[in-house]
Amino acid sequence: MSKQILWKDSWQAIPRSFGRFIAISLLMLLGTFAFIGLKITGPDMRQTALDFFKQNNLADVTVTSTYGLDQTDQQTIKDQVGVRQVTFGYYQDAAINHSQTSIRVYSNTKQISKYQLVSGKRPTKANEIALSTSLQGKYKLGQTINLGHTTELKNQKFKVVGFVKSSEYVSRTDYGQTNVGTGQLSGIAVTTKNAFNATNYNIARVTYRATKRMNAYSDRYNEYTDDKKTQLQTALNKLRAPKYQNYQSQITTAQNQVTQLEQAASANPAFQTQLSQAQAQLTSTENNLKNLGYPSYTVSTRSSFPGYSVYRSNSRRVDVLANVFPVFLFIIAALVSLTTMMRFVKEERITIGTFSALGYSHRDISLKFILYSIMSSGIGVLLGAIGGFTILPQIVFKAYAASSTISGLQLHFSWTYLLIVIAVALCSTTLAALYALRKDYQEHPASLLLPKPPKAGSKILLERFTPLWRHLSFNYKVTFRNLFRYKSRALMTIFGVAGCVGLLVMGIGIRDSLSGIISKQYETIIKYDLIVAQKAAPIETESQSYQKLLNSDKVRRHQAIYTQQFNKIAGSDQSTQTITMIVPANQKHFNKFVNLLSPSGQELSLPKNGVILTQKMADLLKAKKGSQVSLKDANGQSHHFKVMGIAQMYMGHYLFMSRSAYEQSFKTNYQTNAQLVTLKHNSSKQVKKVAQSFIRTGAVTTTSLNLENQQLIANVINGLNTVIVVLIAIATILAMVVLYNLTNINVSERIRGLSTIKVLGFFDREVTMYIYRETIILTTLGILFGYLFGYGLHAFIMINLPPDNAMFDDSMYPLNFLISTIIPCLITLGLAFIMHRKIRDVDMLEALKSVD
């Protein structure tokens, strides 16, 4: 039998129902775009970073020491089991042209943690320097910069010959702290080893043989490097006491020389000059030794490199969103597509009967629906996959790239995600159509040539409430009858609208939660502008300058504190968390600097015994009031604390103690080592200026500016905001397509009924409202259920989205629900005008005779 007519009818079905065809394509496009795009972005970001690290042979571990690395230190590092390569180098912090721009100057390395040249050339002479790309806007190639007087560098003036990227500094905004300039590094620089004066190296970079075959973002790699870090730290700690004794013996020798010179000078005044020089040298050495304290070694894994963990966390935040938003979005799109295809089969009932009566096989008749479903869903999947694999990852990466040195996202293809999408598309369109056809094929061709008889009439639940039913108008009685008559379509409309509204509530809610973090953290909780860390033994003139600045009119108030950092392995990836302990000297006015609030918002005061731990750390440790927590200090010694309260803190981990609790816990006398400072004018320019003034007193080792912390938070928020805006846009478009599709199905199903009441004399507006009243009721129910759905999704995301060192504001604001209501309402209103025109232009007689 010739299939020409069958093929012709199959192809003509597309233009005959082009709106339905486009709707299915759009649904599949949106679902595929969001699903593939978000699922592939996280892996793309991580693989791009891994390739960057591999290309530059990023160190697995770095070692620095307050006393430098002598031959014994170097040999100890080389002798560690599993070491593949070790390189040693120098670094020195300096301020450019005596400005607020501080940089860390490194000696060039050609093996480990290589510097990637972006423009210009690498320095080859002792007076040449290459700056990090973060400084590219401030300085130009060929420009001469002055790094001031530093004992570690041979030259003060350097010629800028290039701009580089360092794989050890993934962040473009966070370079760490320093004791020059404002106390915050603005970038790094590279010069030759010959440019340094130092006798001992002060940084070692180490790679291990086993890590060459590991994924650097895997738990296996983290566990391995943490283990190697512990081994190396233990080995180096054994050298601390001998090194300190060696320096003490040098001081003793110098003291003996001074004593001898004093005796010589008393006999011969000619030795007086030598005596003065020796005394000055001795005093300087003693002060330096006191400020340096006991020798310490800092062994760091990649997780401690500036921006390394943040970048990984950013990519994993995308993974969290990818496991929620696109999955639900795709489910909604698939279910609506399923409903649409099943309705398409119902509309083609008579055509199916005609072809069946003409002798065409069920397989031949099914060809039309297979072709239609594959074409409509296939176009959507194809376009969505192209955009998902190429466009969406670039949009997300671009948002994060502004604060990262990693550039040039490497796009990857995934058969797994594509096959999942194809399977869902086929199930929701092709299989749905074949399932609906299966029922029709069970009927005789003669019965298929007649419309399917309606279900037997029955009372709806509302009719049993007689007093209420009597007071309803005819229009509302018809509306409620139809709602209960077409239950599956009504439920699908409610589900579709609820899903879209839920995604909007979640998306806008996340955006609100992110936007409120900075104000809550740095206006409600933390009220100081900077922390100033003091030297252990400043000379008298330095102390005087320092106290004078503290009491100047630039400072509104200040609070002496003792601060120390602890570590704890915790979190989803069992990474090292840093906890900052703050112990104020004066507890009475501490709330003017840090406002301690419980999770419920009640004010907390420092307990006489025990500590107050911030909320996120308490969650990671599953600690509550009365729990014992164990933390390690920089030397690996464990300390145990009893939690007496839990306080809000949105970024970072903190532990607060009273003075008496500190002395009781550490068995030592309390002594301050820093100041919390609140300025009268806290503009960005003023804060940096005052921070620089503190550094210049000579009594300060470093400063920590809240401005820098706010910038780090802003970078995270901006990246997530871009993702959320894209998701909100997709959810809005999905709502439009879903509502249009379901409303169109509703009108198509009821075209005979609409024609009937139109013939009976109903006005166009009444005819439209006859059917659109149902849409309004179903949309309203969908919006209400969407609130609950969105609230649950938002709560889930707020638990899983933040990194281990942060907590998001989980509040839901009325404006969120208002916007999430207005969007579907506007779409419904817009569709009302479209459907009104469609219903108005219906050929009533044609519609009424179409099934005869």
Regions found by a protein language model. Name each.
Residues 9, 15-17, 335-374, 721, ...:
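Interfacial "coupling" helices/loops that link adjacent transmembrane helices in transporter permeases
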Residues 41, 48, 54, 107, ...:
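Peri-transmembrane interface segments
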Residues 19-22, 30-57, 392-398, 501-528, ...:
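Alpha-helical transmembrane segments
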Residues 117-193, 202-203, 207-214, 602-660:
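Hydrophobic secondary-structure segments that place a key small or acidic residue at a functional site
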Residues 474-608, 615-616:
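Juxtamembrane segments of multi-pass membrane proteins
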Residues 1-33, 370, 458-499, 746, ...:
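N-terminal Sec/SRP start-transfer signal
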Residues 39-42, 79-125, 161-166, 563-603:
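The feature marks short, hydrophobic/small-residue-biased sequence motifs that occur predominantly
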Residues 338-350, 374-406, 415-442, 743, ...:
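Small-residue-rich transmembrane alpha-helices
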